[in-house]
Amino acid sequence: MKYIITYWTNGDALVRRVVETESMDAAIELLKEDPQEPLAQLKDVRLLVEEKNEN
């Protein structure tokens, strides 16, 4: 399944990423391990994860 992950970075940039994982939880785990901006280092976590329609 593909998921769209939307979040704000510490530099106030809005990031939208499309990831393909088996679950929404797995998509969030990918963010936690992101070497560029790990989820744990974000100052204000406003996170949206939604399923991506294949239409």
Predicted regions: what is each one?
Residues 24-25, 38:
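N-terminal cationic amphipathic segment used for targeting or macromolecule association
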Residues 2-4, 18-20, 46:
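Ser/Thr- (and often Asn-) enriched beta-sheet segments in non-cytosolic proteins
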